[in-house]
């Protein structure tokens, strides 16, 4: 029996209409299209990360700005500007949401500190995402879209620091790698042709700094970019600061 005949016999068209779908045969394949384009049952906006999802949780006031605001380094206007540029969001409980949006403006995932990811929730809610291969990019990568190739890029560990530093040093594009387990040599591939500086956290043993020296060597062997690892904290942080594993923003706030 031909597939067209099977389709008619099984009354799949009628079944489809009953659940809001138009069922058609196209080039030998079944094609199901929502009868109502606005039918939320078949909207992918709430299955995979989307700019609609990003927009629905947007916010512009965050507690992590308070040290910089209290020190007079930032104004509330700058806080709102940074929150808008980085598409920051908030959970219902008030925790900041840091979206990973690539250089094609595709939201890939979102990080909710300290160690929770939106992709985990989506997989729990939607069985269809069981085999979803989640990709990550640098936080702030979307800022390349409207930047010149000559604009320097700086990379820190956490998103809060990148957002605040972007207002302190606006001539630089600030990004974050979020955590070392997410680092791979291809993470920096979209930055080819640019001058990039990594600002590692310091620690008493210099292990983090040495790790990034090795990482930078691997990246340079694979991708064409002018990559440096900043040693400011290794040279100028106190023993106490190194024991606390401060980052470059902590150093600025404490200076």
Can you annotate each of these PLM segments?
Residues 65-71, 98, 107:
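Cysteine protease catalytic domains with a Cys-His-Asp triad
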Residues 45-47, 109-114, 230-231:
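Short amphipathic beta-strand/extended segments with alternating polar/hydrophobic composition
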Residues 1-9, 147-151, 162-255:
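TOPRIM fold recognition
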């Amino acid at each position: 029996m031909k597939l067209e005949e099977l389709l008619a016999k099984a009354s799949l068209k009628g079944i489809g209409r009953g659940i809001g779908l138009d069922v058609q045969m196209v080039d030998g394949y079944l094609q199901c299209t929502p009868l109502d384009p606005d039918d939320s049952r078949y909207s992918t906006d709430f299955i995979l990360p989307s700019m609609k999802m990003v927009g629905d949780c947007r916010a512009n006031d965050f507690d992590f700005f308070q040290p910089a605001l209290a020190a007079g380094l930032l104004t509330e206007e700058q806080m709102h500007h940074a929150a808008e540029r980085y598409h920051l969001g908030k959970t219902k409980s008030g925790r900041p949401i840091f979206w990973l949006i690539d250089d094609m403006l595709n939201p890939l995932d979102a990080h909710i500190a300290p160690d929770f990811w939106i992709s985990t929730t989506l997989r729990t809610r939607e069985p269809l995402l069981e085999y979803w291969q989640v990709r990550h990019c640098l936080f702030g990568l979307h800022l390349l879209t409207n930047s010149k190739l000559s604009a320097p890029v700086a990379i820190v560990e956490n998103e809060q620091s990148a957002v605040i530093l972007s207002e302190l040093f606006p001539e630089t594009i600030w990004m974050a790698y979020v955590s070392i387990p997410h680092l791979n040599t291809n993470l920096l591939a979209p930055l080819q042709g640019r001058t990039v500086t990594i600002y590692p956290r310091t620690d008493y043993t210099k292990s983090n700094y040495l790790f990034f020296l090795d990482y930078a060597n691997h990246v340079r062997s694979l991708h064409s970019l002018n990559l440096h690892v900043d040693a400011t904290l290794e040279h100028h942080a106190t023993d106490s600061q190194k024991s606390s594993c401060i980052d470059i923003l902590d150093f600025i706030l404490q200076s």
